[in-house]
Regions:
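Bacterial Sec-dependent N-terminal signal peptides
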Residues: 1-15
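Accessory cap/linker subdomain of secreted extracellular hydrolases
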Residues: 178-219
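Short substrate-entry loop that stabilizes the transition state in hydrolases
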Residues: 38-83, 146, 158-159, 182-184, ...
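Conserved acidic catalytic loop of the alpha/beta-hydrolase fold
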Residues: 103-121
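Cap/lid segment of the alpha/beta-hydrolase catalytic domain
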Residues: 77-100
Length: 279
């Protein structure tokens, strides 16, 4: 009963809560946004920062959560061997790093669901850049915490594509700029950038189109919200999935390495995808 009182008070105040959970000897910190009037068993969305980043409260999901009534968990990555906060996705310079972020994020999800009375069934994962790579790794992994993933400027590392076999279909939505020079749209199979070899974005997404057995592609072109940057967005939606798991790819033509909030309502678009799987 005491937990219910605390959560109700927090929700009414519409504020960020700072919390932490010890996993494998590491204290894993996170902030949690609970919008005003949030209901028990509300959906939960995780947002993961990029390489070298920190808990980012001003991320694209928070304003959408404020309007739509879901919670946003924003975890902090641990420092890798280079001393940079990150998620362990198997970059070459992370070799030997024993942190298991698939396990850690799954444990945090279970803790947050129970502690703050949020939905165990309707928990989703999104993230930017290194956080996007973590979304792909989670999709490939044998995990039950996250129902769908939405990487932003994320990549599938060649080692994932080569060595892992997804144990089950999962809905996936990628947003990526064609002029991204950090996470190249065309991939980097020779590891020229030093992040490790990674797949071209269309091929990486195509794996999930095949895995999810999507049989139809719908394509729509929309202009950027910023009428002066010359960008436009091609929305590829792969539907009619025999597994019930659609795949979306938003190709931001001219877009660079960003969350693309100048080009589209990123948080709203991601939530519109996740919301299809809320039960």
């Amino acid at each position: 009963m005491m937990g219910l009182v605390v959560v109700t008070a927090i929700a009414h105040a519409q504020q960020f809560v700072e919390d932490s959970l010890k996993v494998d000897g590491y204290m894993r910190r996170f902030d949690l946004f609970l919008p005003e009037g949030i209901k028990p068993d509300a959906p939960l969305v995780f947002y993961l920062h990029g390489y070298g980043g920190h808990i980012y409260r001003d991320n694209p999901m928070v304003e959408t959560a404020r309007r739509e009534g879901f919670a946003v968990c924003i975890p902090q990555g641990l420092k890798d061997p280079k001393g940079k906060p990150s998620w362990n996705v198997g970059y070459p310079f992370q070799e030997g790093w024993k942190v298991d972020d698939v396990k850690s994020l799954s444990k945090i999800a279970t803790y947050v669901q129970k502690r703050y009375q949020l939905s165990r069934e309707n928990t989703f994962l999104t993230g930017m850049s290194n956080g996007g790579e973590m979304c792909y790794l989670m999709a490939y992994s044998k995990q039950k915490a996250f129902k769908a993933v939405a990487p932003i400027a994320g990549l599938t590392m060649v080692w994932m594509y080569r060595d892992l076999e997804a144990c089950k279909p999962i809905p996936l939505f990628e947003i990526h700029g064609t002029e991204d020079r950090t996470s190249e749209w065309t991939g980097d199979l020779e590891n020229k950038g030093g992040w490790g070899a990674y797949m071209p974005v269309p091929l990486a997404v195509g794996y999930w189109v095949a895995k999810n057995r999507c049989t139809k592609e719908e394509t729509e072109r929309v202009e950027s919200l910023n009428k002066e940057n010359g960008h436009y967005v091609i929305k590829h939606r792969f539907t009619d999935s025999a597994t019930g798991c659609d795949v979306w790819l938003y190709e931001v033509v001219g877009g660079k390495h960003s969350t693309h909030t100048e080009d589209l309502h990123t948080g709203d678009e991601i939530w519109s995808f996740f919301k299809m799987y809320v039960r």
